[in-house]
Amino acid sequence: MRVFIFIYIFIFSSFLSSDETKDPFENLNRKTFEFNENLDENFVMPVAEAYSKFPPKIKIGISNFFNNLEEVDTFVNQLLQGKPKQSINDLTRFVINTTVGLGGFIDVASKIGLERHEEDFGQTLAVWGVGQGPYIMLPVLGPSTLRDTLSRPVSSFLSVTFHMTETDVNIALKGIDAIETREKLLGIESLLSGDKYSFVKDAYIQSMLYEIKDGIDVQDDFIDDMDDFLID
């Protein structure tokens, strides 16, 4: 495992830049963004709008379920980032919510004071000093960076569903998760002005930095950047 980690960093750190605003593929990224927008407008958004009409308690339960599936990924990456205390917290959350919380549909752990964290292998690479590389807009999957794109196979391997379900069920779960996430963003478009591509890019980069730094020293910059795009 340690050899794998060393090779992974050695190969990719040689060409991943730490430049936070690099977008050398902007022309291609914008075309991909347009494709994603059309897909969203014609399929994802209508489904998300239908989902928004579900009873709040059901939506909360579904959100809790998918949050619980991410706990194992977070637990492993907390360990890789040298955060043993947080990793124990996250593993405990997973055990409690999976058992007492009926498969994760009820967030019992939060009710007893166990705070939820979100970590992935992309953040772990950042903590290890691997630069983010250029900004990339992925078809269907949306905004990313080269570092986060290369980290996806590891994150997929750490996914609970990767090991516990058939491929078609795994795909179905990912689809439901995407719709659940999209439903939370309904209405944001009406608050934006200017170049939506730039907004999405800046929002993604700022959110990524916020997660990497655990919210330290980036919140004010994030708010200032978002103000530039919001309609008065």
Task: Locate each region found by the language model.
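Positively charged n-region of N-terminal signal peptides that target proteins for export
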Residues: M1-I5
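N-terminal signal peptide c-region/cleavage motif recognized by signal peptidases
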Residues: I11-S17
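A structured, mid-to-C-terminal "fold-capping" secondary-structure block
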Residues: E20, W128-D232
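Short N-terminal segments immediately surrounding and downstream of signal-peptide cleavage
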Residues: E20-E34
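Amphipathic, well-ordered alpha-helical segments in soluble domains
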Residues: N38, N42-P46, N68-F75
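Membrane interface segments of multi-pass transport proteins and intramembrane proteases
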Residues: N42-I60, G122
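Beta-rich strand-turn-strand
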Residues: I62-F65
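Mid-length scaffold segments of soluble, non-membrane domains
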Residues: N68, F75, Q81-P143
